[in-house]
Amino acid sequence: MRFFTTEGPVRAADNYCLPPLQRWDLDEVLGLIEQKKYFLLHAPRQTGKTSCLLALLEYLNQGERYRAVYANLEVAQAYREQVDKGMGAVVEQIARGARDQLGDAAATGLAREVLQSSTGGTAVGEFLNRWCQGAARPTVPLLDEVDALVGDTLIALLRQLRAGYPQRPTAFPQTVILCGVRDLRDYRIHASSESAVITGGSAFNIKAKSLRLGDFTAPEVTALLTEHTIETGQVFTPEALARVWDLTRGQPWLVNALAYRACFEMPQGRDRTRPITLELIDEAKEYLIINRVTHLDQLADKLREERVRRVIEPMLAGTQLGQVPEDDIHYLIDLGLCRMAPGQGLTIANPIYREVLPRALAFTSQASLPQISPTWLNADGTLNPAQLLDAFLAFWRRHGQPLLGSAPYHEIAPHLVLMAFLHRVIHGGGTLEREYAIGSGRMDLCLCYGAMTLAMELKVWRNGAPDPLAEGLTQLDGYLAGLGLNWGWLIIFDRRTGQPPIAERTATNAQSSPQGRQIAVIRA
């Protein structure tokens, strides 16, 4: 039996998968190898890079033109700035790959000999030089996780490859493929041996090209999910197929995680006589988000980095990016957190990430909340919007000011505290979805609890800006129209200096939107 997997690399005998060599332009790759080019494959984590490298390894070694060897350099990360030990680990990994993949037992002996007589600054180059000289076919090393190396160890590797480059293909590899998360040109290498930051492009200026492994396309998502149908007879409804694409935008790990949860973990999905429905996919999505599975937790952890905050904070606030360094934007795209959307500019990569990021940022505020009685529930357990509004106003007046300090992003602190409160409201019984974008001037929230849907728009009144009430009412009209609702909340956080304390200024009143919808305006 095969299954969807989130622990790569994929094995076609065990896992549903797309043919790895079809995920990139194989003719282009083979052309670069034939031209003796050194190049890079990069993509966000858990997108299939290693699976593609291993498929290429098998493809090349089945032919008679090249001998390819795969080596994962992550083991050298533990040595950080210790060049001798780090480069020794790189040499050993390549030699073991030669032994295990090519049956070249002599490579490990050569590695030991080289390491006894060479320093870390020359060991990799010396080993590759001597190993290639005795080869009947040109050598193609596939070096994975190259960006696990840092500082002096990364510089040492790149410079040795550059130094040996003129000797290819008889006394050095014909082609070297480096694989990692970031494009090498965007590396900013802080080496203890150098007084200035070194860019990857200057340390490895022999690189011919950078290939980026993309996410799945919509047809590829359908093809992958159909593998399960072919094997088991269990179908995905058209709505479920569309929902997987809409939620993930083809991010490979997310596609597999949703499908695995729906088909192999949820009791309804394990019944192969029942189709996988949109509702099952939505339940799987909520499970992944609430449980902060490893992939999502790793992304959320990046929010602590200053260069990530410089981009994500204005996106959440709906303001312009301002003077954000170009490298920060490239970094978030390389991480897979963001993408450039046609006609929209920079945006969060997919709806699941769009949910995870603000939820992660609101976690500390949520943990800081005092005990709150659920006065917003009717006797039958349904949500009462009027009582929820009263509960929020009481909560905000009493706890808003101190809780703002618990939010990690100052510009959106009110948003995060509000979301923390709403997560307490829906705990175990509803969902909270968010919409935000650069320059939109707002964040939209949609709270669903049973049959009740409550939409709200969050705006900030900043120094020097006019009262956002009129703009907010117009914008909220459009949001409510899209949801088919005729009422909602407009929350205006007053962040101007010199305002009365939150406990004194928080108030609400009823307004009509330009299209006649009933709006509760909350000034906080």
Summary of predicted features, one role per range:
Residues R96-A156, R162-T175:
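Mid-core helix/loop region of P-loop NTP-binding domains shared across ATPases and GTPases
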Residues R424-A451:
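Active-site metal-binding core of divalent-cation-utilizing nuclease and nuclease-like domains
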Residues Q62-Y79:
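Conserved catalytic segments around the Walker B and adjacent sensor/switch elements
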Residues P9-V10, T153-E239, V244-L247, E265-I289:
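The catalytic "switch" region of P-loop NTPases
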Residues M1-T47, S51-L60, E126-W131, A386, ...:
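Walker A/P-loop-proximal flanking segment of P-loop NTPase domains
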Residues T6, A68-V69, R80-A105:
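Conserved NTP-binding/hydrolysis module of P-loop NTPases
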Residues L469-L473, D477-T508:
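Nucleic-acid nuclease catalytic cores
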Residues R23, P219-T222, T226-L335, A341-P342, ...:
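Winged-helix-like regulatory helical subdomains adjacent to P-loop NTPase cores
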